[in-house]
Amino acid sequence: MIDQYKHQQLQIGLVSPQQIKAWANKNLPNGEVVGEVTRPSTFHYKTDKPEKDGLFCERIFGPIKSGICACGNSRPSGAENEDERFCQKCGVEFVDSRIRRYQMGYIKLACPVTHVWYLKGLPSYIANLLDKPLKKLEGLVYGDFSFARPSTKKPTFLRLRGLFEEEISSCNHSISPFFSTPGFATFRNREIATGAGAIREQLADLDLRIIIENSLVEWKELEDEGYSGDEWEDRKRRIRKVFLIRRMQLAKHFIQTNVEPEWMVLCLLPVLPPELRPIVYRSGDKVVTSDINELYKRVIRRNNNLAYLLKRSELAPADLVMCQEKLVQEAVDTLLDSGSRGQPIRDGHNKVYKSLSDVIEGKEGRFRETLLGKRVDYSGRSVIVVGPSLSLHQCGLPLEIAIKLFQLFVIRDLITKRATSNVRIAKRKIWEKEPIVWEILQEVMRGHPVLLNRAPTLHRLGIQAFQPTLVEGRTISLHPLVCKGFNADFDGDQMAVHLPLSLEAQAEARLLMFSHMNLLSPAIGDPICVPTQDMLIGLYVLTIGNHRGIYANRYNSCENYPNQKVNYNNNNSKYTKDKEPHFSSSYDAMGAYRQKLISLDSPLWLRWKLDQRVIGSREVPIEVQYESLGTYHEIYAHYLIVGNRKKEIRSIYIRTTLGHISFYREIEEAIQGFSQAYSYTI
C-alpha cells in the first residue's frame, strides 16, 4: 500500500466481502470466474502438480514456472490479444511466477463466521458495539442458544424478541421439536437466528451515529449523578463510564475509516498466497509443509460437509447442521488464533499448529523478525553505558562507529578541502587514521543528528534524536535521564544508531525527535525525564549530611567573620572534630574539600548573601548569644544571623554540607543556562 506521500506501508484492518472477491477473482476468456478454493487438496501424488481448485491451484494463484501453464505450454511470441494471456486448455495465466507471492484466493463459507480477533480480543469490539456480555455472545456464536427475530403481524411460531435463554427458560424445550421437522429451515430463516449469522444481523442493524449520541447522553447522566457513597455502586458507575467512552471511540473510528460493523463477521475467508505457506519436498520423499495449509484443509473439509448438509436440509437433522456450523466456526478460529478455544490443535507428533496470529505476533513473528529486525545501511549497534558528563541532547559515539557512519561525508569534505585528490586516497587516509580525518569528522558530526533506537519500539520515545560526540572505547554513551523513555538500563542493553540522510529526515529529527523536545510522556503527559535508580542514590548520598546537633557559640562559631576567609591551609585548629568550620564562599569550601580537609557530609557554616533571606515568618531562634560589644548571634536550626548593637544584620551563615553546596551550584548553573537559552529564543 502506498500513501499520498508515496511511502510504502502496511495496514491491517477490516475489508468488505466485495473487496476480498476483487483481490482473488480472475475472469477467464470463456467467461469462467476463478478465485474460489473449493478443494482441500494440494499436489497430485503422481504428477506432483497442483490440484485444480485446490490450495495451490495454478488457475487461482498463477503458474509455478514463469510464463508456463499447467499443460507445459508457453505464450506464443508476439501475442497481444487479451484472450491469449490465458491457456485455452487449462486456464492458467501466462505471467511471472512471482505472482504467487501476492495473488490471493478465498473460501466461500457455508455459514457466517465471526472473526475471533474482534470477538474474543481485549476489549471485544463486537461486545462493545452491541453492548452485551461477551459470554452471551459466545454462547450465541457457538450455538448454545438462539436469538428470536423480531415478530411480525403474520402468524409465527414465536412472538418473542431477545435471547431465549435469558427471557424464557422453557423456550429451548418449546422449539426443540421444530429442530427435527422437515420445515426447520423455513422456521429457522423466518423465526430464529443462531450462530454468527445472528451476530451479523445485529451488527448490520446498528446506526453508529445513534450509538454515539445515546452513549454520550448516558455518560452525562452518570456524570451528573456524582458519588452516592456506596463504594460498589460508585465502582460500577466508573466502569460503565469508561465503557461508554470506549464505545463512542470505537463507533467514531468505524465512521472515520468507512468500515461497516458487520464486516467483523466473515462470509468469505481469504486464502494466503501459496509462496507465503509453502510445501517443500526433501530427499527421501519427505514433505515439509506450513501449518497454515493444514488449518486451511481443516476449514475446507468442514465447510464442504456443511454445504452438503444444507443442500439436503430436508433429510439432515437440524442438530447435525447446527453442530457442523459450530465445527466450521471452531476451524476458522483455529486458523486465525489457535489458542482462542483453550487448548491449541496439535498434529500427529504432538506439535502445536502455528496459526496466523502465531506467525505474525511475537519476537519471532513476521513483523519483528523479518521486517523490523533487518540490518540497514548507515546504522550501527553497540552496548550503552552511562555518560554523566553529557548534555541531555547528546550521545557519545565510539570512534569506530562514527567513522563508519560518516565515512562518505568525511570523504566528501576531504576532497572539497583539497586534502586528497580522489576517493581511493581519502579511504587510505581514513584507514591510516590521520589527524585531519578526526578534525573533519568532528566538523561533520557537529551539524548532523543521529537516531538511537532500543528494541522493542513500543511507543514513539523508543526512537529519539541526539547530537553525537566522539568518545573512546567501543560503547555508546547515553545520558541517564533519557533511559526511561527507552525503557533501558545499563546492565548490558544494546541500542542501534541510525543516520538520517535527507534534509527532511534531519529536520524532523531536530524539530520533533530530539531528546530535550520529549520531556513528557505522550500517553499520560507526566514527566518522563526524571531521575531514577543510580541518580536517586547518588543524590541521596550527596545530600544526606551528618546528623549532628548544632554546635555553635561565641567561643567557636564565627572567629573568622565578617570578611575574614578561612585559612584551610592551616591544619592545626580550624577543623577539629568538635568545631564546624565557617567559609566565606562556596569556592573556599570546595578548596577545602580538594585538600581533603573536609568531607562531603561534614557540617559547615557558609556565609550567605544578605539579599537572599532564609528566615521563616514564624521561625524563632533556638538561642540568642550576646557579646560584650553588643554583637549578637541568633542561632536557628539551619542558619546563623550575626548582628550589631543597632540591630543591623552584618552577615548570615547557613548550616549545610559540601554535598548540598555542590547540588545547589549544579541546579543554579542549569537554571541560568536555561534562562540564557530562553532569552536567545525570544
From Swiss-Prot:
SMART domains with a match to the protein in the record: RPOLA_N
What are the GO cellular component annotations? chloroplast; DNA-directed RNA polymerase complex; mitochondrion
Query: How is the cofactor bound, as the UniProt entry phrases it?
Result: Binds 1 Mg(2+) ion per subunit. Binds 1 Zn(2+) ion per subunit.
Key word Zinc present = yes
Q: Where in the cell is it found?
A: Plastid, Chloroplast
Signal peptide (from-to) = none
Record-level Gene Ontology MF annotations: DNA binding; DNA-directed RNA polymerase activity; magnesium ion binding; zinc ion binding
User: Keyword annotations for this protein?
Assistant: Chloroplast, DNA-directed RNA polymerase, Magnesium, Metal-binding, Nucleotidyltransferase, Plastid, Transcription, Transferase, Zinc
What PANTHER family does this protein map onto?
DNA-DIRECTED RNA POLYMERASE, DNA-DIRECTED RNA POLYMERASE SUBUNIT BETA
* Entry's family note: Belongs to the RNA polymerase beta' chain family. RpoC1 subfamily.
Q: What is this protein called?
A: DNA-directed RNA polymerase subunit beta'
- Protein source organism: Agrostis stolonifera (Creeping bentgrass)
